[in-house]
Amino acid sequence: MLTGRESLVRLIGRRRRSPLPAALALAVPPSRSLQDDAADAEREAAAGGSSSGGGDAAGAAGWVACPVCGESIRGTDYCVNTHLDICLTRGTKRKLTQSTLLDFSFSRKATDDYALNNLNTSDEAEHMEPTDGNVSSDGAFFSLNNDKVNSKGSANASSPGCLHGSPDISETCDTCLPPNVLLPYTENTANNGVVKKCLSHMPSTDATSSTIGLLSVTDSSNSVVVDTVIVGRRFHENIELQEGASITLLRDPQNAKDPDAIKVLYAGYECEQMLGYLPRELAKVLAPLLDRHYIECEGCVVGVPEQQLDHVPIQLKCQKYTDENETYDDLKHPQFLWENFICAVGNGNLLQPSSTRYQTNFSSMITDVMANHSHLFSDKEKSFLDSFQLLPDDGQRLFVRIYTRKGPWFRMSSISYREISDLGQAAMELKLAGYIDMISCMDDLSNYDLKEVIDVLSVPEMKEILKELQKNNVSCTRRHELLSTLLYLYRNGTCTILPKRILKWTGTCIRTSDVADELLWRVQRLFFLNGDQDLSFFLLVDLGLVRFPVYACTISHRVFQEISDLLQYEEAIQVAQVMDQSLDNSNMEMVTRCIELSENRLSTAPKEENATRAEPPPSFFSRFSASSVYSKILTLGVSVYERDRRYTDAIRVLKRLLSTVASDRKRGYWALRLSVDLEHMNRSNESLSIAEAGVIDPWVRAGSKIALQRRVVRLSKPPRRWKVPSYANAVTTNIKEVNIEGRPLNCETGAKNVFYGYDGELCGVEQLALQYYADEGGGWRGTHSEGGIWMTIFGLLMWDAIFSDVPDVFQTKFQTAPLDLETDEFYRSRKDLIESQLKKIQDGIAEEILISSWELHQGTSCRGVNWDRHSLTDLRAAVVCTGGHRLASLLRHLALDYRSWSSGMPDLLLWRFLDERGGGEAKLVEVKGPRDQLSEQQRAWILVLMDFGFDVEVCKVSPVSKRR
């Protein structure tokens, strides 16, 4: 992969269906705006009025009866066709009961009442799923169990239109919304009125109420009855369920996924017959009471689900223990836990069906962003996003489902979610609200990318279309060939009826609208602040598969202080996406245009970013600037130019980067590549000058600095330079080498080195070296982890410093490291705390700190910490045998510059104990196979480790000599 490509892909994250930036836009169709949608709706209404089958119905006012289900529907062709598609796919007559958009009052439906009614209906209880979060169940993965979306769409999205050439989103948001959706959210007084109106319809959450969601209080002071479910049945499906059978609870504090786990067992059996677990959210508030023996729980199975692995409805009675001898002070803590339990169960979200948890997560993401970043949205954009909360549940769920899919188009006939009661009604409401686009056989596809629509078709359907078009001479059978053939027939003008034929086969299709896609991309980026994370992380947390650390979010500066900062950042990411897509498609003309545009933007960025501000943001916020993105694009561009041997262009870009980006860890890489490319152009004197300047640059560190120093030593021989550099001896230091031989499986150039190990099994060079050191090399034990084990040790020993309360470094609840970890600010902001910890390590108590940190945080996500790969036993051995002084020096080095030194460490960490009292020694080994050489980063690490007093060597593995 080209240098810089992986970093750019991570930055982009989910590709947007966005138009090209103005400077990159070619002759592409104009983007579809909200006004276009409104105009289409008017044309449909007019067409429906003129062609209505009833004859008397006029436009949108005409109503007809559906011949399938008998429901009254609007008499327009569009509405009739859409409704018939949905009815026919059901296969049975079914009366629609959900209100239409015009009847909807836009007050939030009581979640508690909804959950209560569903769980109290025996026919529907089996279709409900819990909040899940269960330690042992993946049944709540809605993408695995509940959905049946059959779309063959690709992830590639076209880029119709021009971002700056099309109407602004904020100017068009209101045209797609029904009048009763646009509430006056722009003013505080009006907004408060809306909130009060919505809250007036919500049920009471008072813990003393006789009915609180799923909680039935039989005696508010002593006992409660809770209707809940058993999750995790897939692990215990061999246990037969019996309706009415008594059950009991058993704590499982040793559970690796969830220390609050509670098992559900059959009561009264001699041997434990485990049925599953309680949902995670319920177990979280119930576990403290059970651990302290404050309550006693018993219950029964109230129903047996139709599907073997579905969640099992149960009823629990939780009884408080009472002791007349206990004093008031003794009862305060238990009473607090009891009240916390009552309030938590009374909250409707606690026992919310897992199939709708994604809906709540999506809504909470929008709410959080609007609360903390509202200054980055116009009033009309806010109204558009706020209207999502006013949509009925079916509409919200359908939108979240398709938004999290690749798509972009989905057939209505292929969508089936059991938590959505009326798919057709939900789609119509979303279309009227402007959240989705909908196409059917009556629509014109000229405003859409035909390729995206064709992607919905299967291969047999494409072949049938070609037959209908009498193109029997086409012999292609592969999907991409059929797709190209259909597009060719349409674009050359020989088959103008192709769009109608395609829609005849696809039926009604939906996708997220451009406006919704743009705004929600912004919402998601502001919520997670990166491209690596998305809505799936909510689900991973709910399931207990990922646990994030506990830290304080102390925010004193906004990441984007002004909307112009965000818009520039968004445009830069758009350019990065176009660059990435163009490389995929080998469109070198567009790649070159992206590089040139980034050069121009970068040259003007400092003037804009250095504008005087009352409180400048922290330096580690620079990653969220447009110039940071453009520098990544240009870094990748240099790799592209060098690959094509366009050294003149590469030199120009590198000089631009070095002259405009003053503080970036990539300066070392840029200086090195510039020096190398100048030498390719036979400009050795200039190459030497660049290398000499790079050596004294404070931002040039680690491997890049060593590489530049070695270049200076090589190029500065007389007569260019008569004086020997002061670092000449350091960079030419001899590194201890050990040579071993092995029997190779193959000797092919470029193939991975595979050898026969000491035990006769095939292995790599690292495993062969481990076997050598364990046997002939001196009885060492060890692990092949490169820097992984050291990063894990750093995270565990420095946990408190990493997650200490420092302003602005924690902006979201989904972070595994502070924002300043890879900057110089990390050490400066925590110097006292870090040095205090290093003093303890140097004094020899690193092992105690390691054990304590492991027990407190096991399983919690932290940058660099790998819980599965490294056992506590190996970590303890590494810490003890390394020694406090050397370990403290290594950890300080990482704390000072984590980014530069988090890679390139030796392959093997070896240790051996010298006596029973725990004394030991450690060795680090870099293993090299035939034809392998040390990288500059590896050389830099070895020199640093030698300075710290580590025993370091290079083990070279070579094939057995043929003379033997």
UniProtKB/Swiss-Prot annotation:
One of its GO terms (cellular component) is nucleus. It holds the Pfam family VRR_NUC. Zn(2+) binds at C66, C69, H83, C87. Keywords: DNA damage, DNA repair, Hydrolase, Magnesium, Manganese, Metal-binding, Nuclease, Zinc, Zinc-finger. Mn(2+) 2 binds at E786, D907. Belongs to the FAN1 family. This is Fanconi-associated nuclease 1 homolog. It comes from Oryza sativa subsp. japonica. The lineage of its organism: Eukaryota, Viridiplantae, Streptophyta, Embryophyta, Tracheophyta.
